[in-house]
Design a protein with these regions (language model features):
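Sequence/structural segment immediately N-terminal to covalent heme-attachment motifs in c-type
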Residues: 42-69
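Substrate-binding/catalytic groove segments of enzymes
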Residues: 61-62, 74-78, 114-118
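Gly/Gly-Pro-rich "capping" loops immediately C-terminal to redox-active cysteine motifs
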Residues: 65-103
Length: 135
């Protein structure tokens, strides 16, 4: 139920914004990011699909959880370099998902690493719904 409220809040935030979606490339928050990707997907985000996607290896060696943790509420460790990875869940890292440019770069790089392709808008929305619902 809390995730549904998060999704609805996110949609209201973007739909009532006086700025077009392209103007949201400034600093943002998790709710706005979810609304942007849900709108681009053209369908409601599903946090359960997002969790399954986040934890799956997709036929390769890594999953999102390989570096970000399972769940991604604490500090992770990059599977290849051993570098520290900040918590990804906005509830435990208020700076997470607060820059559209960084979110776009994060999805582009990590989807390519895990899937060997760009994530779809629906996959991004689902993952954001999952992350936003974590406490």
């Amino acid at each position: 139920m809390k995730t549904t409220a998060f999704i609805l809040t996110a949609l209201v935030a973007v739909l009532t914004s006086s700025q077009p979606l392209s103007a949201l490339s400034r600093d943002t928050n998790a709710a706005e990011q979810l609304a942007i990707w849900t709108a681009r997907a053209g369908a409601p985000a599903d946090p359960r699909r997002g969790e399954a996607f986040f934890n799956a290896s997709h036929g390769g060696q890594w999953s999102c959880a390989s570096c970000h943790g399972k769940p991604p509420t604490g500090t992770g460790q990059h599977a290849e370099t051993g570098k520290r990875v900040s918590p990804l869940a906005p509830a435990t890292n208020p700076k997470a998902l607060t820059s559209s440019a960084k979110v776009d770069k994060w999805f582009r790089r990590n989807c390519n690493d895990v899937l060997s392709r760009e994530c779809t808008a629906a996959e991004k929305a689902d993952v954001l719904a999952y992350l936003g619902g974590l406490k």
